[in-house]
Amino acid sequence: MLIVLSLGGSILAKNLDPDRFLKYANALRDISKKHTLLVVTGGGEAARDYIGAARAMGADEVTCDYIGIEITRLNARLLISALGHDAYPEIPSNYPEASKAMTSGKVVVMGGVTPGQTTDAVASILAEYLRADLLTIATSIDGVYSSDPNCDPCAVKYEKISPEKLINIVMAIEMKAGSKSPVDPVAAKIIERCKLDALVMDARNPDLLVEVICGEAAKKSPVSCGTWITAKK
């Protein structure tokens, strides 16, 4: 399968721990033995810190976005270093470059691309552009809930939902102050328009990422650590 993985900066780059990068690199190696893999890295806490500092100095939002993109690309560079010869050595700056890099047979790693888009959105657009078989959004939340579980103790987790239902959930959550959706609205719309199979999962344990993608992805069977998004009945 051709898989695009959105790897959240909050789980990859937590405390900039080299061992964490190496563990994710090992997981990605294992996945790439069975699948063609492209990874989009998030910015995590470092991106938020830099953007916060820029805003405090009066930077406009486009500048803040570019700062965030640079941090995601730094995380991509660190992950490439951890992967060594198993990674494509350069960071694609756009979707055609990523497509070309994919032909190398290596794990392709990239960061943000365009101001105003999260790396989840970048990953979903990349998956659409490449006609990927699966988009995996690896985060610290174990799937999609009816509302933000951090704010609502009665939130219900879904094993499988349609893209249309995902959009309704995402928009409802985003409208509530202090609430955060596991998938951003742009990514949700891309998933809907291209009828892309996607998995939102808790990937704080890199080994679990391998287990799910290599073991359950082809079957689309329920997983305890995530939610499937599929247009297929």
Curated annotation (Swiss-Prot):
Activity regulation note: Inhibited by UTP.
* An example Gene Ontology biological process: 'de novo' CTP biosynthetic process
Q: What reaction is this protein's catalytic activity? A: UMP + ATP = UDP + ADP
Entry EC number(s)? 2.7.4.22
Compartments (UniProt record):
Cytoplasm
Q: Name one GO cellular component term.
A: cytoplasm
Stored Pfam families: AA_kinase
Q: Give the matching Gene3D superfamilies.
A: Acetylglutamate kinase-like
The primary location reported for this protein is cytoplasm
Give the top-level enzyme category. Answer: transferase
Q: Which InterPro entries match?
A: AceGlu_kinase-like_sf, Asp/Glu/Uridylate_kinase, Uridylate_kinase, Uridylate_kinase_arch/spir
Highest taxon listed in the record's lineage: Archaea
Which pathway does this polypeptide act in?
Pyrimidine metabolism; CTP biosynthesis via de novo pathway; UDP from UMP (UMPK route): step 1/1
Keywords tagged on the record: ATP-binding, Cytoplasm, Kinase, Nucleotide-binding, Pyrimidine biosynthesis, Transferase
User: Which residues does ATP bind?
Assistant: G9, S10, G44, R48, T139, Y145, D148
Q: Which GO terms describe its molecular function?
A: ATP binding; UMP kinase activity
Query: Is Transferase there in the keyword field?
Result: yes
Q: Which residues bind UMP?
A: G43, D65, V113, T114, P115, G116, Q117, T118, T119
Role of this protein = Catalyzes the reversible phosphorylation of UMP to UDP.
Oligomeric state and interaction partners are given as: Homohexamer.
Question: HAMAP family, from UniProt?
Answer: PyrH_A (MF_01220_A)
Q: Which PANTHER family match?
A: URIDYLATE KINASE, URIDYLATE KINASE PUMPKIN, CHLOROPLASTIC
Family to which this protein belongs: Belongs to the UMP kinase family.
- What is this protein's name? Uridylate kinase
Q: Which organism is it from?
A: Methanosarcina mazei (strain ATCC BAA-159 / DSM 3647 / Goe1 / Go1 / JCM 11833 / OCM 88) (Methanosarcina frisia)
Q: What is the lineage of its organism?
A: Archaea, Methanobacteriati, Methanobacteriota, Stenosarchaea group, Methanomicrobia
Q: Which gene encodes it?
A: pyrH
